[in-house]
């Protein structure tokens, strides 16, 4: 009788290295398609949006590639956070990635409704650019952390480190939104409400959904 080997930890799953290499190539290709896009993401992390709200130039190919990098990296981190024991499967990772993509699509739809309701197309486009730059920085941080976390066999340490990274990400988003919007106490309360409803709540939904998928 032949014994079928099982993937019992992330580091022993050969597909993980290929996925991480693919995500790295996505970042490199995006930088080649639009030179300076990654550097710009880091240099504008705490920049304040100009009040002129000028036209924003978009490169659709670069945006598509960077979205693949962001979703793929965050899905890997989410899978690793929800992972307990047993097989570390590529199919499960794809399901988690699809779950992340679905939540992002809902957030985008909500943002589009806000844009349509308040007629803030130019301002919304510029804010979206700054937001995408911020998430590029956050996912670069997650990617570097994953290179370490995928090679250790300590689920408790992995969860705590990923939780700490998530808290740092939320703090960065909070600081960025204060830089963009905060003018008085009312705007500050709006920012807090936004962070809770469109950042923290979706993150909790992602974690719960990933837990069901992995189980």
List where the protein language model places each region.
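Alpha-helical transmembrane segments with an aromatic anchor "belt"
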Residues: 82-151
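N-terminal juxtamembrane cytosolic/stromal segments of multi-pass membrane proteins
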Residues: 1-65, 75
């Amino acid at each position: 009788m032949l014994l079928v080997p099982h993937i019992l930890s992330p580091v022993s799953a050969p597909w993980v290295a290929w996925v991480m290499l693919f995500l790295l190539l996505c970042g490199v290709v995006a930088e080649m398609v639009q030179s300076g896009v990654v550097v710009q993401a880091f240099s504008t992390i705490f920049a304040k949006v100009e009040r002129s709200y000028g036209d924003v130039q978009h490169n659709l190919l670069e945006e598509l590639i960077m979205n693949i990098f962001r979703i793929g990296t965050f899905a890997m981190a989410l899978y690793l956070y929800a992972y307990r024991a047993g097989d570390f499967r590529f199919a499960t990772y794809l399901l988690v990635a699809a779950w992340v993509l679905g939540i992002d699509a809902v957030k985008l739809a909500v943002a589009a409704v806000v844009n349509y309701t308040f007629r803030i197309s130019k301002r919304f486009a510029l804010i979206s650019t700054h937001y995408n730059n911020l998430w590029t920085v956050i996912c670069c941080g997650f990617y570097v952390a994953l290179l370490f976390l995928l090679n250790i066999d300590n689920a408790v340490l992995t969860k705590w480190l990923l939780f700490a990274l998530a808290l740092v990400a939320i703090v960065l988003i909070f600081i960025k939104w204060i830089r963009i919007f905060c003018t008085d106490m009312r705007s500050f309360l709006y920012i807090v409400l936004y962070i809770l409803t469109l950042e923290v709540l979706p993150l909790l939904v992602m974690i719960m959904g990933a837990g069901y998928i992995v189980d």
